[in-house]
């Protein structure tokens, strides 16, 4: 589907109504979260190097606060004008994750997976390629979206076998994320 969307002419990609993108605008209305000492140490390690390519593995038990740590890293990326991609292993995790994201940031991230409508795909494609949409949450296929200035890719639950595509073009989304970064 991504390839088909990419081949649509520019006229079809233009958004007729700008309000379709408004819900993705970065907002200042967000909750303030205090990091625990352990989370703060992990965040400092993630933030040590401000430029260049690097890969980190943030490991912790369920409920240990890993999500808040990488939300903080995404926040830093957004503050310098870059975009972020959060990969989830399964579509079923999207709704709950969207709520966490909106609660933390105060705005919606674009959600990309096989069940997204063609109209919404067009809006997201245009918004990411123009830089208007700053964050996308998605399944494996979101790796192929046209980000204008991608600054961070987070692979949530990177050990999950769902990241491995065994049909059609065979690839591992975790490995592709490293290559794309």
Predicted regions and their residues:
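Accessory, non-ATPase domains that flank or precede helicase/AAA+ motor cores in DNA-metabolism machines
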Residues: 1-181
């Amino acid at each position: 589907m991504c390839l088909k969307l990419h081949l649509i002419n520019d006229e079809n990609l233009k958004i007729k109504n700008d309000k379709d993108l408004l819900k993705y605008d970065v907002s200042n209305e967000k909750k303030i979260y205090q990091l625990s000492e352990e989370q703060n140490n992990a965040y400092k390690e993630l933030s040590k190097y401000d430029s260049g390519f690097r890969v980190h593995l943030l490991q912790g038990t369920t409920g240990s606060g890993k999500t808040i740590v990488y939300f903080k890293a995404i926040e830093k990326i957004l503050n310098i004008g870059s975009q972020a991609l959060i990969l989830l292993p399964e579509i079923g995790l999207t709704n709950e994750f969207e709520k966490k994201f909106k609660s933390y940031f105060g705005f919606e991230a674009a959600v990309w997976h096989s069940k997204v409508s063609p109209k919404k795909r067009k809006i997201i494609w245009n918004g990411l390629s123009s830089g208007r949409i700053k964050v996308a949450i998605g399944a494996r296929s979101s790796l192929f979206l046209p980000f204008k200035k991608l600054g961070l890719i987070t692979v949530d639950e990177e050990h999950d076998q769902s990241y491995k595509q065994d049909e059609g073009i065979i690839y591992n989304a975790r490995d592709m994320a490293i290559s794309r970064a």
